[in-house]
């Protein structure tokens, strides 16, 4: 008779990848009695559509949870792997009570900027259509019920070289940024292992902090249809568009492709947020900016 595991650990790889690195991460974190589940989606299949990948992981998860209905669950998702699990958990709230923790490593919850540039009209070009979706509302709902940790790498003061740091954040999750780690390194790195292990020692729900002025302004901009978090590297190119009474400024830079990039700066001129909207949502952006300017 098989011994019941003390934990089920689901660890899911992401786009343009296989399971090997994140399986090693899970093995490093596991107790001797843990049951590891690390589905290999296949490198090539991760380039096409996300729906079959979600269905694959969902089938494996259903079989595992049916086999061990009372075993606590720990979930780790790297990059697109985190997005896959967001979609699965959104479809299966009946599993939430069993999940002890949810760890998202370098997952573009707000939408990947590279994906939005590839698929600016959201028509579903390959995997870009799925990676460019803003899933913050889903993530925030889950984080209210499941202890959630977000880990991001910051190698160039804004991204891990692939995923924008700001795109990984959402209200209700514990957030940890690791300097000088690239996207691929985050799949299995001693620092990441240490952070997850510390979180697992005391997994608790993170109560959202009251929104200050800056957070409210950024949240309002992020709520604009089509707004995608962007790297702040183009901040020096921007010009003040709205100067608020408290000295904060909203700045704009229009790229050579006529894409509007928006920035929020404090009175000291430091960039606090950067994002962009495509041609399709330019009108919505300027409508909100007009409302902010008239307040």
Predicted regions and their residues:
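Serine-dependent carboxylesterase/thioesterase catalytic core
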Residues: 9-15, 19-20, 29-30, 35-151, ...
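A short, charged/proline- and glycine-enriched loop
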Residues: 3-7
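Post-His helix in hydrolase/transferase enzymes
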Residues: 52, 187-202
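Catalytic histidine-centered segment of alpha/beta-hydrolase-like enzymes
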Residues: 47-48, 181-190, 261-262
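Active-site-adjacent alpha-helix of alpha/beta-hydrolase-fold enzymes
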Residues: 150-152, 157-184
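Short, hydrophobic alpha-helical segments
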Residues: 61, 65, 196-209
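Typically the conserved alpha-helix immediately C-terminal to a functionally engaged Cys/Sec
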Residues: 25-26
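Extended non-globular C-terminal regions
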Residues: 210-295
């Amino acid at each position: 008779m098989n011994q019941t595991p003390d934990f089920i650990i689901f660890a899911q790889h992401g786009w343009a990848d296989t399971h090997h690195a994140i399986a090693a991460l899970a093995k490093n974190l596991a107790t001797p009695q843990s049951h590891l589940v690390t589905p290999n989606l296949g490198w090539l299949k991760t380039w096409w559509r996300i729906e079959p990948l979600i269905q694959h992981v969902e089938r494996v998860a259903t079989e595992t949870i049916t086999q061990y209905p009372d075993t606590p669950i720990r979930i780790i998702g790297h990059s697109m792997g985190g997005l896959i699990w967001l979609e699965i958990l959104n479809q299966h709230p009946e599993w939430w009570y069993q999940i002890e923790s949810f760890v998202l490593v370098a997952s573009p919850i707000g939408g990947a900027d590279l994906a939005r540039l590839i698929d600016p009209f959201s028509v579903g070009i390959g995997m870009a259509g799925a990676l460019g979706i803003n899933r913050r509302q889903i993530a925030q709902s889950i984080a209210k019920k499941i202890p959630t940790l977000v880990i991001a790498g910051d190698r160039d003061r804004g991204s891990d070289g692939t995923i924008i740091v700001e795109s990984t954040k959402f209200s209700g999750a514990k957030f940890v940024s690791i300097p000088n780690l690239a996207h691929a390194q985050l799949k299995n790195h001693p620092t990441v292992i240490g952070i997850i292990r510390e979180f697992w020692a005391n997994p608790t729900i993170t109560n959202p902090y009251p929104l200050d002025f800056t957070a409210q302004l950024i949240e309002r901009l992020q709520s604009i249809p089509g707004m995608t978090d962007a790297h702040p590297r183009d901040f020096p190119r921007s010009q003040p568009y709205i100067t608020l009474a408290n000295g904060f400024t909203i700045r704009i830079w229009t790229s050579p492709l006529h894409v509007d990039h928006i920035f929020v700066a404090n009175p000291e001129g430091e960039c606090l947020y950067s994002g962009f909207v495509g041609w399709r949502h330019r009108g919505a952006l300027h409508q909100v900016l007009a409302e902010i300017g008239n307040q």
